[in-house]
Structures are given as C-alpha cells and as structure tokens.
Amino acid sequence: MKKVLVLVSLLTALAVTAGDNSNISVEAGYNNQYIVNGVARSEGTPFVGVGAVKSLKYADVYLGGTLLANGDLDQSHWTLGAGKEVNVWKDVFSARLDTTVTRHQAGNFGIPNSTEFGVKLALPNKIVTPYVRGYYDVDLKQSGVFVGAERAQKLPFGFVVTPGVEYGKVEDYTAVNAKLALTRPFETSFGVFTPFVSAGWYDNNFNTTKYNWATREFSGDIVYSGGLRLTF
C-alpha cells in the first residue's frame, strides 16, 4: 500500500508540473515475468506504472515508476533519464542518446535492492532502429552491453506492431530475446487509451545457484504481458 501511495503522489506531482511539450502516462496490466537486463526479477504479477516526459530545449527529461504488486513480495522500479535526438542525415536517419539512473526496490523478495546507471545510443530511421546500450549496477557490481534492433510498423485499423531482437553480454551471464508488441491507440477528448500486449522468446545462462538477483534461468521461455495505458 505504501508504494501505491508513492505512485499516486508521483502522478499528482507530475500532473501539477506538466505543461506544454509534456505528457503523462498511467498504465496497469499483468506479466508472467518482469525482465531487467535479460533476466527475470518477478513472476506472475499484476503491475501499475506512471511516467512523464518533458521536452526541453536541449533534452527530453523523463521520470517513471512501476510497482509489481504481490503482497509481501512486491517490487518497484524507478527511472530518471534524459535524452536528445539529432538529425544526422535529413530524411534518412537520426541519432538519439539517452542516459538513465534506475533504482530497483525488491522489497522482501530476496533479491537485493540496487541502483543502475545506463546509457543508450540508437539510430532511428524509417526501416529499422538499431541500438547499443550499456549499464553498470553499483550494488550488484555488474556491467553489461546489449545490442538490438526494433521497428514500429503501422497496420490496418490503427494497430501498430513492433518486433525486436536483443543480445546482451553481462559479466556473469549472456542473454538473448526476440519479442513482438502490439498496440492500438484510441484518441479521446481527455487522452489516448492504448491497449497493449507483448510476447517474446527469452534465453540466458544465468546461474541461480551462484547469484541472487534473478528468480530463474531462461531456456527458451515465453514471456508475455498485457494491459492498458492512458496518456494525456
């Protein structure tokens, strides 16, 4: 309940400070696995989340939080970030650089709380968006680099499908996944409602007998989630 109140308080503060070039989102749903850097951090949990983006002159600043509600085993994950996209080749591709700091609060789940710093470079274009990202977790003493690609494709009747693939090399494991997300935005007078679903194939060689920051090893497992998002 305490973390739910924190989310509500955060949303209220974001709503008060929002203005032009800003948007706020609220979402709720369910996932069978919550993924952090290619490994499972929670299993079979409903979730709620809030987020806000403010576009400033030199960067987009964003803040968000997700609560995985599971009684005494709840978790929360909080991210503060900033990013900037610049045009590299007009009408061909651009470059976007993001830096983030994320706090992982595992509650009583048995996974240590930790703080993670990340950076991501993407090359958005009309065909496919490749990216490379890296992170360092100061509490888990883990660093890793991930490379991937994704593409958002409009479909008939307002649907958008986004396939993606990613491979990562972390100090104590490797991870790979291929996933597909489907959304259908509905514009209303007070915001955009977006139902969303996603499913993916995940594999890694994480050793749960040696390390305690994931719940299991993936061996070609299917990970899925679904929910509803409101953006205003």
Regions found by a protein language model. Name each.
Residues 1-25, 231-232:
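Cleavable N-terminal export/targeting peptides
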Residues 18-23, 55-60, 87-96, 109, ...:
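Short loop/turn motifs that connect adjacent beta-strands in outer-membrane beta-barrel proteins
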Residues 18-70:
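Short glycine/proline- and aromatic-enriched beta-strand/turn motifs that initiate or cap beta-hairpins
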Residues 22, 42-48, 74-78, 111-117, ...:
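Residues that define the transmembrane beta-barrel architecture of outer-membrane proteins
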Residues 26-28, 61-65, 97-101, 119, ...:
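Membrane-embedded beta-strand positions of outer-membrane beta-barrel proteins
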Residues 30-36, 56-58, 65-71, 86, ...:
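Transmembrane beta-strands of outer-membrane beta-barrel pores
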Residues 157-212:
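Outer membrane beta-barrel transmembrane domains
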Residues 180-182, 186, 218-232:
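Outer-membrane beta-barrel "beta-signal"
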